[in-house]
Amino acid sequence: MPVAATNSETAMQQVLDNLGSLPSATGAAELDLIFLRGIMESPIVRSLAKVIMVLWFMQQNVFVPMKYMLKYFGAHERLEETKLEAVRDNNLELVQEILRDLAHVAEQSSTAAELAHILQEPHFQSLLETHDSVASKTYETPPPSPGLDPTFSNQPVPPDAVRMVGIRKTAGEHLGVTFRVEGGELVIARILHGGMVAQQGLLHVGDIIKEVNGQPVGSDPRALQELLRNASGSVILKILPSYQEPHLPRQVFVKCHFDYDPARDSLIPCKEAGLRFNAGDLLQIVNQDDANWWQACHVEGGSAGLIPSQLLEEKRKAFVKRDLELTPNSGTLCGSLSGKKKKRMMYLTTKNAEFDRHELLIYEEVARMPPFRRKTLVLIGAQGVGRRSLKNKLIMWDPDRYGTTVPYTSRRPKDSEREGQGYSFVSRGEMEADVRAGRYLEHGEYEGNLYGTRIDSIRGVVAAGKVCVLDVNPQAVKVLRTAEFVPYVVFIEAPDFETLRAMNRAALESGISTKQLTEADLRRTVEESSRIQRGYGHYFDLCLVNSNLERTFRELQTAMEKLRTEPQWVPVSWVY
């Protein structure tokens, strides 16, 4: 078969070589010869010639082994060389850029509007998200086969399994690995996602480091880290491989609710390997194998680093030193110590604000969602900071898109009042019964009458196809922050004292307001604003400083428009 194949290919090549002398010998037109050469050089014609040759062998009852058949057609080479790779793994971001560009022309072009509609379809978005997940290989590794012997991996490593690994680096450059002592040996404890070693893939967790540039490493992890950090040029590591299967990162994203600086952390195994972040940052957790230290990276990009785990940070924040005091009869040096008895409390809704102050906020798992419209817009802020003015302006600006609830009250209606216009009127007994049944988002009493917002009123506005705009107390956000109401929480922050005083003075002069606030009132507003931000800042999606009502309103409009065109990070409980 190989001989026949060679002869057939040689014959075709001879025809091609002789085409150059055909014009003078046959008088053929040059254009026709070019056409003939194209046919002869066509891969299809060459394949047909090979098929004819194979059919001839079959007619002659000549057996040809499959390996020669594959080699003859070149199939084995194509199978080895063909490797499909994704062009990119961030197609969702590309689509969002396209949608932003289409937003400018969608109103003038029906084709652009139709394209924008297709690109925002949930099925299409899910397809892109699945493609990006496969392209970036962020899928979970299947569990190991139960048939494998667990003791197999614990067998001693033969001496000939020692490997030499070469790495080129500059002095001071971190390799992205940490070490631990195990059985008197230095073992790779973790490999930081995105680091030099992780990118090269030459080292694995569990590998034993024996030598660095021919020098034994001993058993001190800090000394080895210092040696590797200061090394430059070519670094040769002598290792005993662990043969452990690497774990692919799982897609876990969290929103941080505290600031962290590894340089100030005395517990971190390696300060240089730590990842700094601030409250509100979004991180991807790429490794949670260690109970105390996770590996994470910022969603915007960059190398991974170590961060304290949920368990470690909870222990650290919950730890309170025992209050010690000397007993009345004790001496200065030899007296006994007694601890103050701690107060124990059961959770009560009436003590909701008290428990909020002691809530431990570490990480919140979130998920990235395609653009969608929120059902409620919640404005939080101190009294007198301008929440109600912003709510009214937003509803007047687009009454078809935004709406609000009608509050309920137990007071009797005035002669000029009508049911549902300004207030809904019910008896005090009925309202108290509904409050006990949990049908009110919030309620209060003023001059002997009850006032409140019913949860069903919010549902009614949402059912009408509108975004329900609410200006409520911060405690109410905990009730609203569910998959049913998917709120967008905006904190209206009070400006500094001088700006607030100037705003009140300008409102009086223009006739917008008739109430002159005292300095005590203004300072109370600033202090209350700071207190709300400290206690409930983890619930806020956006913070706006209301130093100018018109500018703040425009910023609020812009933020609401972005929700329709840009991806959003929401609590994972809203999705699953």
From Swiss-Prot:
InterPro entries: GK/Ca_channel_bsu (IPR008145), Guanylate_kin-like_dom (IPR008144), Guanylate_kinase_CS (IPR020590), L27_C (IPR014775), L27_dom (IPR004172), L27_dom_sf (IPR036892), MAGUK (IPR050716), MPP2_SH3 (IPR035602)
Post-translational changes noted in the entry: Phosphorylated by SRC.
Record keywords, A-Z: Cell projection, Cytoplasm, Cytoskeleton, Membrane, Phosphoprotein, Repeat, SH3 domain, Synapse
Pfam families linked to this entry: Guanylate_kin, L27, PDZ, SH3_2
Effect recorded for residue 363 to D: Enhances association with the cytoskeleton
Boundaries of every Guanylate kinase-like domain copy: 374-561
Residues in L27 domain copies: 8-60, 84-142
Domain PDZ, chain residue ranges per copy: 185-240
Annotated localization: Cytoplasm, Cytoskeleton; Membrane; Cell projection, Dendrite; Postsynaptic density
SUPFAM superfamilies hit by this protein: L27 domain, P-loop containing nucleoside triphosphate hydrolases, PDZ domain-like, SH3-domain
Record PTM Phosphoserine, positions in chain: 42, 145
An example Gene Ontology biological process: protein homooligomerization
Disulphide-bridged cysteine pairs: none
Ribosomal protein recorded as keyword: no
Residue(s) carrying Phosphothreonine: 141
Signal peptide start and end residues: none
GO CC, alphabetical: cell-cell junction; cytoplasm; cytoskeleton; dendrite membrane; dendritic shaft; dendritic spine; plasma membrane; postsynaptic density
Domain SH3: residue ranges: 249-317
Main location: cytoplasm
Quaternary structure annotation from Swiss-Prot or TrEMBL: Can homomultimerise. Interacts with CACNG2. Interacts (via the SH3-Guanylate kinase-like sub-module) with DLG4/PSD95 and DLGAP1/GKAP. Interacts (via the PDZ domain) with CADM1 (via C-terminus). Interacts with KCNN2/SK2 (via N-terminal domain). Interacts with SRC.
Stated family: Belongs to the MAGUK family.
Chain's role: Postsynaptic MAGUK scaffold protein that links CADM1 cell adhesion molecules to core components of the postsynaptic density. In CA1 pyramidal neurons, required for synaptic KCNN2-containing channel function and long-term potentiation expression. Seems to negatively regulate SRC function in epithelial cells.
Protein name: MAGUK p55 subfamily member 2
Gene name tied to this protein: MPP2
